[in-house]
Regions:
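Generic recognition of well-ordered alpha-helical segments
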Residues: 7-10, 54, 58, 77-80, ...
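Hydrophobic membrane-targeting alpha-helices
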Residues: 2, 14, 20, 77-84, ...
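Hydrophobic transmembrane alpha-helices and their immediate junctions
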Residues: 61-111
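Extended hydrophobic-aromatic, low-complexity segments
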Residues: 21-25, 67-69, 121
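Generic hydrophobic alpha-helical membrane-span motif
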Residues: 29-31, 58, 69-72, 123
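Transmembrane alpha-helices of multi-pass inner-membrane enzymes
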Residues: 101-147
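Long extracytoplasmic/lumenal interhelical loops at the membrane interface
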Residues: 1-10, 17-62, 85-88
Length: 147
């Protein structure tokens, strides 16, 4: 099993063989949890491997409903972050805006990286990602002092 395209095609085949709306089952395919637990016995037709695409892994495990919910979460978080960055114009210093933009840029990099790696499976990465999201949103609430 070499190459991402073969892995992605295998994942999509498995999704459509199971339930496309609800998926194959959380933690049962394409990632670290599935590799460690091995709930399903491996044979010639099925073997465990890393999906190397977190969004596609989410689609296969949770179906179209789960992927749509996850994308809504990420888009909503991104919109809130952009709104907070826009509100940093009201801050006393430009440093707040630079910090907010820098944190959001890092988050965008992680979201793009998820197309090529299961980066969200790493607990530290998830903690850093959602902490950065919270920090960006918080920075949008700083205000200039009234005189």
């Amino acid at each position: 099993r070499a190459g991402r395209m073969v892995r992605w095609a295998t994942g999509l085949d498995l999704l459509h063989e199971s339930n496309p709306l609800l998926g194959f089952g959380l933690g049962r395919f394409g990632g670290a949890v599935a590799m460690q637990n091995k709930i399903i016995e491996q044979n010639e037709e099925f073997s465990y491997f890393y999906m190397d695409n977190y969004y596609l892994k989410t689609l296969v495990e949770m179906g179209y409903i789960g992927l749509i919910a996850f994308i809504i979460l990420l888009v909503g978080m991104s919109l809130w972050c952009l709104r907070s960055i826009g509100r940093t114009k009201l801050c006393e210093t430009d440093r707040t805006r630079v910090l907010a933009v820098s944190l959001f840029s890092g988050m965008c990099g992680v979201m793009v990286h998820c197309y090529f790696e299961n980066i969200f499976e790493v607990p530290y990465m998830m903690a850093y990602f959602w902490s950065m999201a919270a920090a960006v949103m918080y920075l949008g609430y700083f205000r200039k002092k009234r005189r």
